[in-house]
């Protein structure tokens, strides 16, 4: 559906989104790798009721993910133009590509936190909470994009909808994890 909204702004914007998402994927694919490792680590230690080890592993992965997100943010926000030019050097695409990378750059740390938090939940065998939050907030991108694109933001409204939904997911999921983890300790 977002592609349909973007298509109203022309082929250049579609290309910008495709290339921009591939560039941005470097951070979320890496964070996904951390989440997969964390899922296995949490699951193994949850089975042996080693909560101290779980907490230590989560802290280490969280710091690595925040560092990854910070590097991605710096790269996308401050070096978006040279990065984008590596992939597309068409003058009419560059300003839009830089906007895409900059706007998505602001969400890199929360996005990394979102992804590893899902890995933590999965390690505990709790898939409903992150699934519901992810589905609702990812789905919220559509009405947000429709609203934002009707303003002076234009196609940048789609990029803001994507970025804001990631920021909210990366802010809400850790709170739910904290509450879930607190409940787990009380039940253990």
Language model regions located:
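Transmembrane alpha-helical segments of integral membrane proteins
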Residues: 140-149
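Short amphipathic helix-loop junctions that connect adjacent transmembrane helices
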Residues: 3-7, 149
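Residue-level micro-sites within transmembrane alpha helices that shape
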Residues: 21, 31, 101, 107, ...
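Short alpha-helical transmembrane segments in multi-pass integral membrane proteins
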Residues: 42-107, 148-188
């Amino acid at each position: 559906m977002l592609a349909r909204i973007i298509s109203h702004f022309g082929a250049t914007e579609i290309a910008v989104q495709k290339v921009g998402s591939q560039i941005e994927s470097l951070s979320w694919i890496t964070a996904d790798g951390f989440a997969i490792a964390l899922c296995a680590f949490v699951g193994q230690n949850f089975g042996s009721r080693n909560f101290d080890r779980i907490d230590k592993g989560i802290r280490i992965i969280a710091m690595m993910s925040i560092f990854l997100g910070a590097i991605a943010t710096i790269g996308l926000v401050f070096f978006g133009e040279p990065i984008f030019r590596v992939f597309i050097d068409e003058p009419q695409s560059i300003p839009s590509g830089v906007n895409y990378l900059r706007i998505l750059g602001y969400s890199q740390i929360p996005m990394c936190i979102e992804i590893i938090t899902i890995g933590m939940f999965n390690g505990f065998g709790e898939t409903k909470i992150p699934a519901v939050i992810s589905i609702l907030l990812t789905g919220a991108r559509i009405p947000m994009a429709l609203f934002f694109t009707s303003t002076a933001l234009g196609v940048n409204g789609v990029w803001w909808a994507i970025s804001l939904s990631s920021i909210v997911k990366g802010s809400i999921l850790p709170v739910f994890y904290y509450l879930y983890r607190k409940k787990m300790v009380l039940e253990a």
